[in-house]
Amino acid sequence: MLKRLCTILAASALAAPLALGIARANGTEELTPYKMIRSLQYVQDSVVLGDHSAIEMQRFMLGAIDERLRAADHSAFRDPRNVDAALVYVMSGGNPATLDLLADRDIEGNFDSRVTDALRQYLNGKGPLIVENLTKAAPEYKNSRIGPYLFLILGNAMSQQDPIEAMKHYDWARLTAPGTIIEEAALRRSVSLAAQAGLPEKGFRYALNYARRYLTSPFASQFADVFVELAVAHFDEAADGRVSEILSFMDSARQREVYLRVARRAAIAGNQALARLASRRAEELAGDDSSRSQVLASFYEGLAAVPSADVFSAAEALEAIPDEKLSPRDRALREAAKAVADAVVRPPLGESPAQAPAPIAERPAGEQSELAAEESGSGMSPFGQPVEASPGRPSEMTAEADVAASDDPALDGFLASGRSKIDEIDALLKGEGQ
């Protein structure tokens, strides 16, 4: 009886402030912006910690705060907490036009023009232009309410120019805002930058921290993309142990998905050993639960085997997989693999020295554009970068042309055919990423 009475009293104590708040909201008193922004921060942090039902509340809160900021009298922003609330709002997915309105109406100088100008440029897609000015202004806000947000924005703005320095800004942002959407974003983006900068140990450390805390985030799929990029680019015996440690925080279905992504990326990159290893681990995790996962694992293992001595068996295995079991992107991969297999097993053109190479059928222009659009769609990693030509490629092509300019017409024809086949494969794989 006493226990039940204590429970009732505790519930009453918690309900009283909520009821009072609702009564005030329905009355003449309006919530100030800084109080509303606290609720938004709580909701956003709940989302990345796994409460996906709060996503709709986040949208509602953003709309309500937008209306409140636009309706606020300019005197409200004499309180620095409301100024910070307006800045946090726009850095949390709010309406950029609201910041424009508030900055233009600020006749008392309540807003720091260095910060508002930088944010307005950043939100208009001009991130690289703000680096110099925000680098000077941000340290003044290190210990303020907006500090973690500014350092996250600064890291984003300079990530392509200086990924190592950007990671330092991400470190500061996440360490001053643990357990928040700021830390989640900073860790996820740091994994991508570490992969780009060739710092695998640092990248795996970021990935481990992310896996421990944020696997239930709605952005975890983006993390999986950049983690796969890191694992494939820097895989060795030591990395294998780190990958296994990070995946241990995932359930079997997520582990299988990651291994399938690793197998696919490794097969495209020509890393046969890794593609086979990841495919076999995905098959082991699939068991009897997912026939499609087993098919994909076998498919990626077959892709990896195409350039090997077992090319005939690999080509037959790939051909045996039904089209409906593969996505359009994987069907394009299979076409490329078949083209490679045909080039490997085709005998040299030695019957007639003057025989011209057979023409290679090209895809219609419309079909190629459709494939390119599909390959660059939502299935690609948001952090993926377009494939860039290797600096050494022109000299390689020049050397190849020198060899081709020999006195052997059969060799000329074989090399010309090979170059045409490579061009065809490149077209099929366009948009796949590295």
Swiss-Prot record:
Compartments, as annotated in UniProt: Periplasm
Range of residues in the leader sequence: 1-15
Location of region: Disordered: 344-417
Keyword terms of this UniProt record: Chemotaxis, Flagellar rotation, Periplasm, Signal
A single cellular component GO annotation: periplasmic space
Biological process, per Gene Ontology: archaeal or bacterial-type flagellum-dependent cell motility; chemotaxis
Free-text function comment from the UniProt entry: Required for the rotation of the flagellar motor. Might control the energy flux or coupling that drives flagellar rotation.
Name this polypeptide is given: Chemotaxis protein MotC
Protein's gene: motC
